[in-house]
Amino acid sequence: MMGLVVVTAIAHAQQFVEDSLKVDGYMRRFDLFLPEGIKPDAPLVFYLHGYGGHIYRDNPMVETARREGFAVCIPQGLKDPKGKPSWNVGYPFQEGWKVDDVKSLSKIATYVQKRYQLSRENTFLTGMSNGGEMCYLMAYSKQKAFKAVAPIAGLTMVWMYRDLEACKPIPLFEIHGTEDRTSEWTGDLENKGGWGAYMPVPLAVGYWVAKNRCTKEETERVESLNKENGHYVIKHRFTDSATGCDVWLYEVVGGKHSTHTEDLHTGDEIWSFFKMYVR
């Protein structure tokens, strides 16, 4: 009963809560946004920062959560061997790093669901850049915490594509700029950038189109919200999935390495995808 009182008070105040959970000897910190009037068993969305980043409260999901009534968990990555906060996705310079972020994020999800009375069934994962790579790794992994993933400027590392076999279909939505020079749209199979070899974005997404057995592609072109940057967005939606798991790819033509909030309502678009799987 005491937990219910605390959560109700927090929700009414519409504020960020700072919390932490010890996993494998590491204290894993996170902030949690609970919008005003949030209901028990509300959906939960995780947002993961990029390489070298920190808990980012001003991320694209928070304003959408404020309007739509879901919670946003924003975890902090641990420092890798280079001393940079990150998620362990198997970059070459992370070799030997024993942190298991698939396990850690799954444990945090279970803790947050129970502690703050949020939905165990309707928990989703999104993230930017290194956080996007973590979304792909989670999709490939044998995990039950996250129902769908939405990487932003994320990549599938060649080692994932080569060595892992997804144990089950999962809905996936990628947003990526064609002029991204950090996470190249065309991939980097020779590891020229030093992040490790990674797949071209269309091929990486195509794996999930095949895995999810999507049989139809719908394509729509929309202009950027910023009428002066010359960008436009091609929305590829792969539907009619025999597994019930659609795949979306938003190709931001001219877009660079960003969350693309100048080009589209990123948080709203991601939530519109996740919301299809809320039960």
Regions found by a protein language model. Name each.
Residues 103-121:
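Conserved acidic catalytic loop of the alpha/beta-hydrolase fold
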Residues 174-176:
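Short beta-strand/loop motif that positions the catalytic acidic residue
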Residues 178-219:
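Accessory cap/linker subdomain of secreted extracellular hydrolases
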Residues 167-172, 243-247:
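Short, proline-enriched alpha-helix->beta-strand connector loops that line the catalytic pocket
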Residues 11-44, 53, 64-67, 93, ...:
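A domain-start/cap signature at the N-terminus of enzymes
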Residues 38-83, 146, 158-159, 182-184, ...:
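Short substrate-entry loop that stabilizes the transition state in hydrolases
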Residues 1-15:
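Bacterial Sec-dependent N-terminal signal peptides
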Residues 77-100:
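Cap/lid segment of the alpha/beta-hydrolase catalytic domain
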